[in-house]
Amino acid sequence: MKNNYTSLKSPLDEEDELKTDHEIDLEKGLLPEYNSEEEGALPPYSDISKLANPVPEDSSTGPTEIANPNVERRQEFKDSHPNIYFLLRLLISVLAVSVVFFTAWVCVNPLEKSIFGKVAFSVTIGITCPILFIAIFYFYETWTKACGKGIKHFLKKWRNMFFTFCKSPIFCLVLLKAENKLSSHLGDQQWGWKCSASAFTFMAVSSILIFIAETVEPGSCSTDLVKRVQAYCDYEARQYASSNTAIPLREMNPENEA
């Protein structure tokens, strides 16, 4: 019985197969012998073998990192001029502590006779200033790197700053109006001053936080926040409804109890 098998490949395809079978990679050279009987053996030059046997990294150096020119310049300046680098850190720390000290002095000086003023001034001088000095002086490189990354990130998001500046004053005006209503309702001058001080402090901190959040992610403090709260409430309602309408397994299979 004759075999009537006819190949579907064209002569050009067969010629290409012959070329690729006997083709030698000039960069890799001849392929070494491959023993398929060995367990875990993979063909040479295989992508799977490269993934299974990665090139070991030098434990002393670790993975290669991309060199940052700013870090290199800072380290070079630190190594070449250690005294100047030390004085620079000391000067920045003293300036920051001086600004905090004089700000506390100006704000607390009218209340120096009261107990609140004495406590606030002593806490500022005894706790805040030393902590600030230690943080700036000993962690100089850490916070400078963090500030540099933050400035670069804000420069990338500069288009969002206009809407952020619009939202922050609106929030401050609403808060200030509420503070005036509360002060006039209480009527006491002392409570009115406390409400004003707390409102302005909260307004300053909230404005900074809103500016940062809105610059990084537009709408995170307004529209997106409302949507997230609404989605969370819907999810809780669905969970509550499903828990009330769920049928226990015993009622579904009464035969199992018997």
From Swiss-Prot:
One Pfam family hit: WTF
Keyword presence, Protease: no
Membrane-topology descriptor: Multi-pass membrane protein
Top-rank taxon, per record: Eukaryota
InterPro entries (UniProt xref): WTF
UniProt key word Oxidoreductase: no
Transmembrane regions listed in the UniProt entry: 84-106, 121-140, 196-216
Subunit structure: Homomer. Interacts with other proteins that exhibit high sequence similarity.
Protein known as: Meiotic drive suppressor wtf20
